């Protein structure tokens, strides 16, 4: 929308209309709804060079694996793998939100965002209480919390009318199916990510700084 408001037109639409690219044209192309390229066509031939400005907005996060949901010690968890350079110890007991899309078996795509609204639940990676973590606290920061420990707590309440195993896991799946119509198999075609929940806030009495998720590396796009 902002590109079009600044005079850029879709390259695909221009080609479909049989229009040729002319010097001075502003065109854009989108790939898989994830990347965007904008071109300001110059006057000189390409052999004389071009200016390229690149920026990315992907940020360190925890991506949900394809077969992520499991139950352990009467708790339901999501298995994740971290993306980007994260300090893993900073992600424990931090309120997390889940963002992404799920492509269902019928082809429908469901957008999922939970944890950002005040009425939403949040999620977290669990950690040991301080008086139970003597061994952990002897380790280095890099060793105290490992990537394998970055599992996200989803729930603890079991199905009451089921005497089988994994009752907490199935209770969570019932909630997901009720709200989004998704099944466990749909995780195979999902792109879901866990990020710190909460809006950007100003820092300091003078409000001179900003605290928010994603400075690395959305600031370069800004």
Where are the model-predicted features located?
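N-terminal hydrophobic/helix-forming segments and targeting peptides
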Residues: 1-222
């Amino acid at each position: 929308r902002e590109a079009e408001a600044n005079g850029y037109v879709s390259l695909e639409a221009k080609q479909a209309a049989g229009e040729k690219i002319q010097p001075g044209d502003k065109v854009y192309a989108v790939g898989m709804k994830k990347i965007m390229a904008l071109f300001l066509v110059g006057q000189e031939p390409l052999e004389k060079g071009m200016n390229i400005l690149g920026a990315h907005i992907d940020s360190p996060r925890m991506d949900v694996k394809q077969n992520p949901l499991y139950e352990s010690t009467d708790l339901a968890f999501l298995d994740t793998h971290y993306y980007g350079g994260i300090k893993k110890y900073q992600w424990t007991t931090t309120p997390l939100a889940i963002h992404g899309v799920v492509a269902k078996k019928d082809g429908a795509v469901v957008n999922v965002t939970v944890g950002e609204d005040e009425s939403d639940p949040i999620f977290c990676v669990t950690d040991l209480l301080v008086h139970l973590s003597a061994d952990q606290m002897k380790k280095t920061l890099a060793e105290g919390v490992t990537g394998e420990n970055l599992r996200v707590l989803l729930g603890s309440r079991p199905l009451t009318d089921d005497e089988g195993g994994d009752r907490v896991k199935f209770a969570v799946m019932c909630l997901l199916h009720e709200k989004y119509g998704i099944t466990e198999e749909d995780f195979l075609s999902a792109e879901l990510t866990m990020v710190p929940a909460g809006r950007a806030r100003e820092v300091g009495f003078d409000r001179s700084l900003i605290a928010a998720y994603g400075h690395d590396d959305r600031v370069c796009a800004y």
